Regions:
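N-terminal acidic leader/helix
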Residues: 2-17, 56
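Extended oligomerization regions of viral-like shell subunits
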Residues: 16-65
Length: 65
């Protein structure tokens, strides 16, 4: 699965969560897939969620790592 697919699954599983964290290893791939660059605080908006870099060796999750 691609980073964007993993993010879609996480969002679908927890649609009320305001944020999503993506592992550092997948961050560049995810940003390229949605054709966005992080803003000044390092977040992007995808499907009305604030998406951030979750750090190395983490999962794609809606809960803060």
């Amino acid at each position: 699965m691609q980073a964007r697919d993993l993010a879609d699954v996480a969002i679908d599983e927890d649609p009320r969560a305001p944020c999503l964290w993506v592992p550092s290893e997948l961050w560049a791939e995810f940003c390229a897939a949605i054709d966005q660059r992080p803003n000044r605080i390092g977040a992007v908006i995808y499907r009305n969620k604030t998406v951030r870099d979750g750090g190395p060796l983490t999962d794609v999750t809606t809960r803060r790592p």
